[in-house]
Amino acid sequence: MTKREKKKPWWKKLIIILAVILVIYLIFHFAFAYFSNVICENLSSIAESEQYIKKGNEKIKLGAYFEDIDSILNQSLELSKLAYEPESKDESRKEELEKLGYENVMQYNNKPSQLYKHLAKKNKNASIMMSAVNATVATKQLDGGETLIVVAFKGTDSSNINDDLSDMYKAVDDNGFHKGFMFNAKQFDKKADKIEFTIDNKKVTLSQILEEMKKDDCKYKMLVTGHSLGAAVADIYSGYILKNEGINDNNIVTVTYGTPKSCAKDFTYSGNNIINIINTDDMVPTIGAENHLGTCLYFTPSESFRKTNYKEHYVTPNAYNSYSDLIKTVESSLVAHNLVFSYTPLVSELEKEHSKYFIED
C-alpha cells in the first residue's frame, strides 16, 4: 500500500459488513419462505407429519370427521396393509376388519382375462392396460349417525411386479392424468353400481352413495387409501370423482403411502384432501408420471428406524447415500424404473466392496 492510499474508516467497513450480512439474511429468509410454501415439508417421522397436518399446514383443512388425523392415519395404514393380503386370505381379512368395527367388507377384483393378457403381450406398442384392479371396500358407523365408506387399493404384488410396474411407463392423458393409473381407477369406478352395501337395513350401491356425496349435508364420508401402485390408483380415483362427478371435498379424504407420480408436471389440483406420505428412502415415488397429485408429506427416517425396520436391507449411511445420490440424478421415469430393477444387484455389489458398512445378521 502506498502512502497516498488511505485506509477506509473502520465504521465504513462495519457498514459494508453489516450490509452484506443483511443481504445474505434476506436471501436465505425469502428462499426459506418460498421453498417452505412450494416444496413439501421434509418430516422426520410420521408422528411429526400428524402434528404438521394439525398445526403447521394451512393448506390442509379437513372438515368434520376428518379432523381426527390420528384416527385417519391409523385406519389408512391398517387398511393399506390388509389390502395386500392374497385372495386366499379374504376371510381372515374380513374377520380382522370386523374386529376393528368395519362392516360390509368386500374384496373387489377385476382380473384381466387370459385373452386380454394375450392381446396385451402381442401388442406391446398398443395402449392396452393389463393390470388387475384390487380393492378392499367396507363401511363403518361413526358417532353422530354418519357412515364411513373405505376403499383401500392393493399395492404392487411381488408375484406380478412386472405387470404392475409396466403401468409406470404409460404416458399422461389429455386431462393430465397417468394413463395406466387412470385406467385402473376407471375400471373400479365403472363397477360402482355393482358394489352394494347394507346400511341401516337398506341396500345401497356405491354409485348411490357417490351421488349423495355431492351434497353438503351428506351422511356419508369416504376414506380412500393405498400403498405403492395402490396409492397412485387411490390418488387418481379420488381426483377423478372429485373433478368429474362433483363430489363435495368435505366428504372425502385420501391418505396414501409410497405414492408414485400420477399426473403431468403442469397439472394443478386446488384441493387439499389428497395427502401422500412418502419415505425419502423409497424409490417408488420417483417413478410414474411427472408429478404427484395432492399434498406430499415427506419424512426422512432416522438410522434407528432404518435399522429396526429395514432389517436385512439395512445399510449404514455411507453405502446407502451413494445409491440415494444416484437416484436423485435421474432425469426420466424410464431411467428411474431401470434403477429400481438394478437395486438388488447394486446392493449386492456394495456389500462385496464395502462390507464394513453392512450390518451382519
Q: Would you name each region that the model predicts?
A:
Residues 1-6, 10-11, 102, 119, ...:
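Generic N-terminal leader/processing signal
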Residues 3-18, 25-62, 146-148, 193, ...:
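Serine hydrolase/lipase
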Residues 79, 151, 282:
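A residue-level signal for conserved active-site and pocket-lining positions in enzyme catalytic cores
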Residues 82, 140, 154, 279-280:
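Structured loops at beta-to-helix junctions and adjacent beta-edge loops in soluble globular domains
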